[in-house]
């Protein structure tokens, strides 16, 4: 594979800050290409998969820079031609192209920050309602929809692997499996407690209510990562899957819950049609949870995973969503805020995720 041509225009990243060093990236890509072409590497399948994954990730980032710079060159030439001809319609097209390039460059810059060990992995998003009955269950259901919409907007696949319905509306808990490039890297910034303030549609007196729900995010563990679990440390429970019913409702005890006794970590799966399918997926979820706990222990700048999981209430919020008496979504970690509450609930989360990601990287560098 030939070495990519050195770019002549400035990179969209601040290379001096160490976010994306172009020369170092090309040298690393050369090294990874050479390793992949070494036939002896494939005698070690796990290592070969890891190297191939790293090469694909870096090649995508290098390609993104080249694609953006090529697009910028074309758009500027297009704008210059439109200006020479005095064609306002062509100029408007050129402006739209430049805006699109700016948006893509901004996202690519943020993705360059996704350098954590598991950032490129798929992930599970676990949502739980807090105290508050109907209101909190409804709010948890709104979060489930919000994250599903965000993932779909970014061409990621979403699978509901577990859901416990609320007594009247919404959900008590649910787990999503999100598959896509850097799914964990992006969604890990959403872990924490989310607070909703609104006039309740379920209160005949139309009083304002405050509700809480939590989101916790765990990376999917692929075959190149070894997580040792002693089967005797895991308790298995089976139960009947819950849901809306219908012709596909499972009338056997096909749902599976696994509890890791030493840590108390529990996972459940009921999406499969058989107990075997649910057991297999539950084991994947348990490995993800234990891997995330290990990652947290390695990060001195963050608390351990189980230390984060305190009461879902006032003192542990990451974001506040106020729908009445005014409209405002504010991230309490970064102070990023917007009055477009509906846009946020429809999955427009990039500004919040980007600011939180940049803050995390900054804290790590300052540590």
UniProtKB/Swiss-Prot annotation:
The modification N5-methylglutamine is found at residue 247. The keyword Protein biosynthesis applies. GO terms for molecular function: translation release factor activity, codon specific. Keywords: Cytoplasm, Methylation, Protein biosynthesis. SMART domains: PCRF. Methylated by PrmC. Methylation increases the termination efficiency of RF2. InterPro entries: PCRF (IPR005139), Pep_chain_release_fac_I (IPR000352), Pep_chain_release_fac_I_sf (IPR045853), PrfB (IPR004374). Pfam families: PCRF, RF-1. It is found in: Cytoplasm. GO terms for cellular component: cytoplasm. It comes from the Bacteria. Belongs to the prokaryotic/mitochondrial release factor family. Peptide chain release factor 2 directs the termination of translation in response to the peptide chain termination codons UGA and UAA. This is Peptide chain release factor 2.
């Amino acid at each position: 594979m030939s070495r990519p041509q050195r770019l002549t225009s400035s990179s969209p990243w601040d290379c001096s800050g160490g976010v994306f060093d172009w020369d170092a990236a090309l040298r690393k890509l050369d090294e990874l290409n050479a390793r992949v072409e070494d036939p002896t590497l494939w005698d070690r399948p796990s290592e070969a998969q890891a190297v191939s994954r790293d090469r694909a990730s870096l090649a995508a980032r290098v390609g993104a820079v080249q694609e953006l710079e090529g697009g910028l060159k074309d758009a500027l030439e297009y704008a210059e031609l439109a200006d020479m001809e005095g064609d306002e319609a062509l100029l408007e097209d050129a402006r739209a192209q430049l805006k699109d390039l700016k948006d893509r460059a901004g996202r690519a810059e943020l993705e360059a920050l996704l350098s954590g060990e598991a950032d490129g992995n798929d992930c599970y998003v676990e949502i739980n309602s807090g105290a508050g009955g109907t209101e909190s269950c409804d709010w948890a259901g709104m979060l489930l929809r919000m994250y599903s919409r965000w993932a779909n907007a970014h061409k990621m696949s979403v699978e509901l692997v577990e859901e416990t319905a609320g007594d009247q509306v919404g959900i008590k808990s649910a787990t999503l499996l999100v598959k896509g490039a850097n799914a964990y890297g992006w969604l890990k910034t959403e872990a924490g407690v989310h607070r909703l303030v609104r006039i309740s549609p379920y209160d005949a007196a139309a009083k304002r209510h405050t509700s809480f729900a939590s989101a916790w995010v765990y990376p999917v563990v692929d075959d190149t990562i070894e997580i040792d679990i002693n089967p005797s440390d895991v308790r298995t429970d089976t139960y009947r899957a819950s849901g809306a019913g219908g012709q596909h409702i499972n009338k056997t005890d096909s749902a599976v819950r696994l509890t890791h006794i030493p840590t108390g970590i529990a996972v459940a799966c009921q999406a499969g049609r058989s107990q075997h399918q649910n057991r297999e997926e539950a084991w994947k979820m348990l490995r993800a949870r234990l891997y995330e706990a290990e990652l947290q222990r390695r990060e001195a700048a963050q608390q351990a995973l189980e230390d984060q999981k305190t009461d879902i209430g006032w003192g542990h919020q990451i974001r506040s969503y106020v729908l009445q008496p005014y409209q405002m979504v504010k991230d309490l970690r970064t102070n990023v805020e917007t009055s477009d509450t509906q846009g946020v609930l429809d999955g427009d989360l990039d500004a919040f995720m980007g600011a939180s990601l940049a803050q995390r990287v900054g804290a790590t560098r300052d540590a």
